[in-house]
Structures are given as C-alpha cells and as structure tokens.
Amino acid sequence: WASQVSENRPVCKAVIQGKQLEGLVDTGADVSIIALNQWPKNWPKQKTVTGLVGIVTASEVYQSTEILHCLGPHNQESTVQPMITSIPLNLWGRDLLQQWGAEITMTATLYSPMSQKIMTKMGYIPGKGLGKNEDGIKVPIEAKINHGREGTGYPF
C-alpha cells in the first residue's frame, strides 16, 4: 500500500477479527480508533475513564476489553486494543502503523513531475524497488567514469 499526499485522504483497509474495515492512516494518533457505528455489537467494550484528546475532546469513549487480531493492508499480522467513539471514520494510529512497518518517505525530486506521474501510473511505489516483488534496485544507477578504457573493447 502506498499513497501520495494529495487532496484525497490516505485510507486503507484492515481486517480486525475477520471484519474488514476501512480507516484513515493517521500518524498523529497514538492509538487506533474505531467509529462507534462500525463496532460490532457482540464485541465487548468498556467505558474508559480517560478521554480522547485531539482537535476535539471526545466525551463517550470506550475501549475494547480484548486484544484483537488484525491483518494490515498487505496481510501484516498485528494486534490492537482500539478505542471506540463517535467519529465519522476509523483512524489507524501509530499502534497499528508501526506493526505494519509503515514509512513516510519524502523523495528528492530527481525526475520531472511528468515522469513521476507516468511511473506511478505504471505501478511504481516510491521507496520500493522495481520488479514483481518490489525488491529490486531502489536508487538510480550512477555512471562510473572509466579512464583506462578497460572493458570497452578499445584496443590498447
């Protein structure tokens, strides 16, 4: 999973206890928060004494009484004990993002915006290598000056 910063919010899917949920990737949140209207009624939760503080303070806050099994966007195994409150969408916080191996990469603009757009459309993910398993070369190959003409086929 990769997402460039744009007008669209970075969302991804996770599977918690077999239930697929979509959430906003939120590196500013210490813990993951599930929207109350998406929390299954049969999953246990308890009211917390501590509130959630962010831009707005949430008043009715719950936490899962159990540590839940979770699969990240690339089936990364993880566990989470999320908070639950009335928010418009789920938030994947650093508690999950760290387990998923999330990275924030700010690449230097070595290439024109047009060439970057073309590469992205072709499936290139910034910070990953090229190739089927994204494990190929991650940085451009640098040309090396060969002053001795060795290996060029030039007669000495």
Swiss-Prot record:
The membrane-spanning stretches of this chain are: none
Task: Give every G-patch domain span.
Answer: 111-156
Changes after translation? Autoproteolytically processed at the N-terminus. Expected C-terminal autoprocessing not detected. The sequence shown is that of the processed Pro protein.
Residues of the signal peptide? none
Q: Does the keyword Protease apply?
A: yes
> What does the record give as the active site?
D26
- Extract the SMART domains matched here: G_patch
Protein's job: Retroviral proteases have roles in the processing of the primary translation products and the maturation of the viral particle. Endogenous Pro proteins may have kept, lost or modified their original function during evolution.
Q: Which reaction does it catalyse?
A: Processing at the authentic HIV-1 PR recognition site and release of the mature p17 matrix and the p24 capsid protein, as a result of the cleavage of the -SQNY-|-PIVQ- cleavage site
Q: Which domain of life is it from?
A: Eukaryota
Q: Which InterPro entries match?
A: Aspartic_peptidase_AS, G_patch_dom, HERV-K_Pro_peptidase_A2, Peptidase_A2_cat, Peptidase_aspartic_dom_sf, Retropepsin-like_cat_dom, Retropepsins
Q: What else is known?
A: Intragenic, in the first intron of CD48 gene.
Q: Name one Pfam family in it.
A: RVP
An example of a Gene Ontology BP annotation on this entry?
proteolysis
Domain Peptidase A2 as annotated: residue spans: 21-96
Protein name per UniProt: Endogenous retrovirus group K member 18 Pro protein
Q: Which PROSITE patterns match?
A: ASP_PROT_RETROV, ASP_PROTEASE, G_PATCH
- Enzyme class, top EC level, equals hydrolase
Write out the entry's keywords from A to Z: Aspartyl protease, ERV, Hydrolase, Protease, Transposable element
Record text on subunit structure and interactions? Active as a homodimer.
A GO molecular function annotation here is: nucleic acid binding
Return the similarity comment: Belongs to the peptidase A2 family. HERV class-II K(HML-2) subfamily.
Q: In the Enzyme Commission scheme, what number(s) does this protein have?
A: 3.4.23.50
